[in-house]
């Protein structure tokens, strides 16, 4: 009998449990290995085990207690996670300046359909961050650089086989105007309204 899905309101992508090494493996829905993994928290020296399903985490092999690195995706407890390194390696060519402090971390897919999978993680423009570190320096430079890190909406585009990172509001509008012009944002701030993006994903996914 199929297991009943927990009624927790969280999106679950239909991928067999396991680790996917490459884009092709992921698209075929054939995991390369089904070794058991644990999700652990990003912050903290001990990297505690996570009881709940989190949007961002590290994954560790249960049998060796070593961190899962250099893979494309993991299907874990019914949830699909992309590795941050894979997102940055398979992104749209216009998204090159985006970076993240935890390339081996995993990001959970929050929504999706036949066209797109949607996720969110904290990214920063590495050129702007480098300027903050180098131009100001010291503690002020650190806080300025940290402050430049924003939660970004990201989609996996099945048709183009790439991730598209919504770097800023104008970048998001360039993407959405071709697909759903009614969802273009007014860009009162540099970053787009993430709540509005989530509603749009519900329409275009």
Segments the model singles out, each with a brief description of its role:
Residues 173-205:
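C-terminal partner/receptor-binding element of secreted or periplasmic proteins
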């Amino acid at each position: 009998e199929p297991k009943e899905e927990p009624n927790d309101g969280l999106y679950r992508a239909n991928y067999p449990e396991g680790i996917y090494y490459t884009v092709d493996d992921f698209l075929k829905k054939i995991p390369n290995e089904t070794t058991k993994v644990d999700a652990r928290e990003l912050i903290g020296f001990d990297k505690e085990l996570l009881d709940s399903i989190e949007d961002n985490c590290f994954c560790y092999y249960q049998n060796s207690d070593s961190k899962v690195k250099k893979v494309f995706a993991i299907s874990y407890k019914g949830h699909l996670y992309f590795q941050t390194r894979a997102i940055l390696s398979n992104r749209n060519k216009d998204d090159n300046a985006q970076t993240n402090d935890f390339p081996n971390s995993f990001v959970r897919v929050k929504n999706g359909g036949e066209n797109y999978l949607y996720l969110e993680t904290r990214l920063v423009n590495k050129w702007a961050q480098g300027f903050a570190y180098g131009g100001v320096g010291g503690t002020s430079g650190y806080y300025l650089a940290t402050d430049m890190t924003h939660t970004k909406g990201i989609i996996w585009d099945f048709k183009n086989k790439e991730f598209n990172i919504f770097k800023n509001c104008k970048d998001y509008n360039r993407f959405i105007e071709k697909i759903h012009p009614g969802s273009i944002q007014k860009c009162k701030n540099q970053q787009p309204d993430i709540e509005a993006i989530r509603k749009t994903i519900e329409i275009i996914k």
